[in-house]
Amino acid sequence: GISYWLEMDTVTGRIGGKVLLAFNLSFCNFIFARLLDNKTANEVAKHLYAIKNNLHQKEMSFCELFPVILTDNGGEFARVDDIEMDVRGESKLFFCDPNRSDQKGRIEKNHTLIRDILPKGSSFDNLTQEDINLVCSHVNSVKRAAFNGKSAYELFTFTYGEELATLLGISKIDPENVIQSPRLLDK
């Protein structure tokens, strides 16, 4: 059986602006995200293709790493074939029941950690992918009691290695340097 899955969701900035396509690996709450120009199925498909291609160039397979994807019924996830298919096989896409975001509760919890840094209603339009990688790196580096004082980054890299984390744009932040507030992105 499947012991873990990849949760996928969007986090919106200002209405009509850029959004985050967020991914959360269920067993360790490791999160990575891509900055989308808009909340459309085409943008989701384009960024998923880029992630898959990036992994493929390093002889890694998206569908082997993430065989099961769980998301909601948002219109941005309508291109099922583009989400599931990969040159090396396919992932299986499952949708939560309507109005049951609790069925992907792990990513919802990480959304609250992202919102500590990017408050609800704030615009993502001036952010870069590097900013989003930094936000996710800080979220992944928070030590968690549920993981016996380990961080999501530590669990993920123990399982998959640092190369994959780096490919996904995530780096380790030392615990004393983790910032969980909007000042993380003060420039």
Features from the language model and the residues they span:
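Mobile-element integrase/transposase regions
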Residues: 1-20
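Active-site beta-loop-alpha junctions of metal-dependent nucleic acid enzymes
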Residues: 16, 33-59
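Short, surface-exposed basic-aromatic patches at helix termini and helix-loop junctions that form
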Residues: 26, 81-92
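Short small-residue beta-strand/loop micro-motif enriched in glycine and branched aliphatics
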Residues: 29-34, 95, 120
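RNase H-like two-metal-ion nuclease catalytic core shared by retroviral integrases
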Residues: 71-73, 78-83, 94-117, 125-137
